Swiss-Prot record:
Tissue specificity as recorded in UniProt: High levels are seen in the pancreas while lower levels are found in the liver, spleen and thymus.
PROSITE patterns in alphabetical order: TRYPSIN_DOM, TRYPSIN_HIS, TRYPSIN_SER
Source organism (scientific name): Gallus gallus (Chicken)
Record-marked site positions (Required for specificity): D196
UniProt-recorded name of the protein: Trypsin II-P29
Span of the signal peptide: 1-16
Entry annotation: catalytic residues: H65, D109, S202
Lineage of source species: Eukaryota, Metazoa, Chordata, Craniata, Vertebrata
Cofactor note: Binds 1 Ca(2+) ion per subunit.
Amino acid sequence: MKFLFLILSCLGAAVAFPGGADDDKIVGGYTCPEHSVPYQVSLNSGYHFCGGSLINSQWVLSAAHCYKSRIQVRLGEYNIDVQEDSEVVRSSSVIIRHPKYSSITLNNDIMLIKLASAVEYSADIQPIALPSSCAKAGTECLISGWGNTLSNGYNYPELLQCLNAPILSDQECQEAYPGDITSNMICVGFLEGGKDSCQGDSGGPVVCNGELQGIVSWGIGCALKGYPGVYTKVCNYVDWIQETIAAY
C-alpha cells in the first residue's frame, strides 16, 4: 500500500492519505552548492510544504498532490530558515491541477501555479527548460529539495539538498510497484536503497541534461531497498503545460 505524506508544520508532523505514496525528501544526498539550483522554489502556507520548479518568469510547475487553494511561492532560496537577500516571494494568482489527476492512483500528478506578478531573473532565480524529448533509462539526473533526510525518523534540513540518481527502466519500475505504475510515471533512484527523495521534497524537480524530466511524486517509504522514488513524467505533459499557460 502506498502512503502520501504532506508536511503540516516545520516540526515535521505529517498526515497520511489513502491511495498511495510517501511525498518525497532527499535521503543519502548532499548539500547543494549555494544557489546552484536557481529553478528550485519552495511552496509555503505559513511553512514549507512542497517544492516546485520555475519554468518561466510567471509560472511554476509542481505536483498536483501539493494543491492548496492559496500558495506562497518563495524563489531564490537556499536556507529556508532565514530571510536571504536573494529571496523573492510571490503569491499565487491561479493554481491549476491536471484535469485528470487522481488522488487515488496519483496518475497525472502535475500542477501549474501562476505567480501574481512576474519575477526578474538573476543568478539565484532562473527557469528550467521543459523536455525536448523523454529521457532514456540510465540518464543521470539531479533531484533537489528541503525534505526529510532520514529514512527512519525526521530531520528537515535548512539548506537545499541534492541527489544525483539515474532513471530506471520501465521494467524495473513496474517490478518494484506491480500494477501501480502508469505511462505517466518514471522511477529514478537506486534499487539497493540508501538514496532517495522523501517527505517535503514533493513537487520538486528532477533535472536531466538541463531539462525538467520529473516531478517528485510518491514512493513506499524513503530510500528502502527495492522501492525507488516515483516521479511524474514531465515529457508527457509539455503540450498541456504550454496550452494551459497560453490560456491564462
